[in-house]
Each structure stands twice: as structure tokens, then as C-alpha cells.
Amino acid sequence: MNKGQYFWNELWCEGRISFHKKEVNPDLIAYVSSLNIPAKGRVLVPLCGKSVDMLWLVRQGYHVVGIELVEKAILQFVQEHQITVRENTIGQAKQYFTDNLNLWVTDIFALNSALIEPVDAIYDRAALVALPKKLRPAYVDICLKWLKPGGSILLKTLQYNQEKVQGPPYSVSPEEIALSYQQCAKIKLLKSQKRIQEPNDHLFNFGISEVNDSVWCIRKG
């Protein structure tokens, strides 16, 4: 287990998961239509944790594919929502699945890419920003390989002064987004606004005075 894997396993084991939200992300509800997902389309949720957003997507009629490093997160998701799953193990990857939900427990960088069938859309609420800068280019490449031509990504990022705190979540600039997805046909900024300070937001607790949240729609050519 490398340093990054140990870090995320420790967070879940100790219950330090303030990044997990109990409500469906309002930006997903507001902007999912911009993805133009076909009926019964496949949606990838990378680094999914136990996000309730996955359940919301399933209820919209989509087939959801989640990839998560920490098995505890997936087990909690299944138990908390009383989902009856089948199990499978392929190599180092463990699979929990139903007819419209397919959850993989593995390091996304080590997953055999052939195990993921092409998807119509990707929903990235907190995956890109969870990765240090040196890993982000490889992550983008992996996800784009799984995305069908013409498919879209709903991506959430944030910006803040990283001199005070290094993350995660990491600050990702619009310039990095433009560079990372330059091979795509369209990069559209759907929303950009200053975050309202909340007591449980650890960025503010570390002395960050300003955080800017952005929502992007990126279409693959």
C-alpha cells in the first residue's frame, strides 16, 4: 500500500470523511441535463466513496459505474441503502453489482481498463480535486479512454491559496482544466462562485479566506 492509499484508508477507518455529503449534490441536479445522457445510459463516478449521488443517478434510470479505492466505503454504501448486491473478484479488483449499479473496489490506476465498458458520461464531483497534481494527467487520460466519443463530463473543481494548505481537496485552476482537456471538443464553464463559509469546511478552518467553486461540462470529440 502506497502513501496515498494508506491516507484514504485511514480516513475511512477513522470516520474522518467530512467530504462525504448526505444530500444529493445540487449541482448534479441542476446540470445533469447538460450531459445529454441517453435513456439507460452508463455513467461513471470515479473515486465514488459512498456518494448518494450514485443512487440519485440510478433513480433517473441510468446505469452507474463506481470506482473506489476503499472497500469500507462501498460496504457502507450498500448497507446504508439496503442494496442487495452480487459479488465478484477479478484479479486485484472486487466487484459489487446489481442490474443497474456496478461498483469496483480497486486503485483506479491499477484497474484493468478492459473491465470498464465505454460510458456515456462521467460525473466527477470530488475525484480530480482529490488527486495531487502529478497524478491528475494520468487520471484524465484514463477517464477519457472510458468515455464514448461525444460523451460528456460534469466536473466540479475549486480554487484557493495553496500556500496555506496543500489539500486534498486540491486547488485546480481554469488554466489546468483547459490544458488537461485540450483534446476534447468543448470545455464549458457552467458555474463559478465564491463559497459561503461553513463551520465544518476544513479549508476555512485552516485559514483559507476565499474559495471559488466551479462546475464544468466537457464534451469529448
From Swiss-Prot:
One of the Pfam families matching this protein, by short name: TPMT
Keywords: Cytoplasm, Methyltransferase, S-adenosyl-L-methionine, Transferase
Cellular component annotations (GO), alphabetically ordered: cytoplasm
NCBIfam families (UniProt xref): PRK13255.1, TMPT_Se_Te
PROSITE patterns from the UniProt entry: SAM_MT_TPMT
Molecular function via GO: thiopurine S-methyltransferase activity
Family designation: Belongs to the class I-like SAM-binding methyltransferase superfamily. TPMT family.
Stored PANTHER family: THIOPURINE S-METHYLTRANSFERASE
Catalyzed reactions per annotation: S-adenosyl-L-methionine + a thiopurine = S-adenosyl-L-homocysteine + a thiopurine S-methylether
Binding-site residues, S-adenosyl-L-methionine: W12, L47, E68, R125
Gene name as annotated: tpm
EC number: 2.1.1.67
SUPFAM superfamilies in UniProt: S-adenosyl-L-methionine-dependent methyltransferases (SSF53335)
Compartments in which it is found: Cytoplasm
Name under which the protein is recorded: Thiopurine S-methyltransferase
GO terms for biological process, alphabetical: methylation; response to metal ion
